[in-house]
Swiss-Prot record:
Catalytic residue list: 11, 130
Keywords (A to Z) from UniProt: Amino-acid biosynthesis, Cytoplasm, Histidine biosynthesis, Lyase
Protein name: Imidazole glycerol phosphate synthase subunit HisF
Ranges annotated as spanning the membrane: none
Species of the source: Stenotrophomonas maltophilia (strain R551-3)
Record's catalysed reaction(s): 5-[(5-phospho-1-deoxy-D-ribulos-1-ylimino)methylamino]-1-(5-phospho-beta-D-ribosyl)imidazole-4-carboxamide + L-glutamine = D-erythro-1-(imidazol-4-yl)glycerol 3-phosphate + 5-amino-1-(5-phospho-beta-D-ribosyl)imidazole-4-carboxamide + L-glutamate + H(+)
SUPFAM superfamilies recorded: Ribulose-phoshate binding barrel (SSF51366)
EC numbers, comma separated: 4.3.2.10
GO biological process, one term: L-histidine biosynthetic process
Pfam families: His_biosynth
Amino acid sequence: MLSRRIIPCLDVRDGRVVKGVRFRDHVDMGDIAELAQRYRDQGADELVFYDIGASPEARSVDVAWIERIARLIDIPFCVAGGIDSVETARRVLFAGADKVSINSPALGRPELITELADEFGVQCVVVGVDSVREADGQWRVRRFSGDPDKTQAVPLRTLDWIVDAQRRGAGEIVLNCMDSDGVRRGYDVVQLQQARALCQVPLIASGGAGAMEHFAEAFDQADVDGALAASVFHSGAIAIPELKRYLRGQQIEVRDVY
């Protein structure tokens, strides 16, 4: 069994890290470089940076801060937001990112997944899936979730999209359960379990972490490869070294903190 990954997520707006609840009411959490270095020093396995305004504002991610981060940290990092072409992905990767994550652009043009996989390899291509449980009990996909006023429902079942994204070349899936985002009540284990049953590539849980037990539940009950979280790390509610010690005590394999 490979070590499970602990992944802080940094939502970026205007070069600053912000965090909201269910994608609303964002609060400034600090400088992007300072937080990135802090998480690297604490033992994060990788980082995800999400330019939350890029896709809703129909612009590309700013590579200036990507270059800055690449000079400062020596752990893998992934960049998401506004990556809608091979050329944009190339700029992001050449600026120093290890992976790109696509979400709304892939929903608008699914063949983008294959284009990126063919150009850079599946190991560089992450597909982010924002999922909401609707009144009929089905989980369906949302797009442009970085801006609640522009978020759109997509008539596509989450589980169907996860299967299709893999077929097209996704090397990793990040499933963000929007109903749980920012409220710290735990990951949506039931949804993650159903995704895991269909997911042949690494699956990352996102949305809902509020206690160390929540990470253990996602790893033990849904068999995810990594757990992504934001507010509990930014606020200091959970420190990564303590989290890793706790997980080891639960017989969950994680990498050492150096």
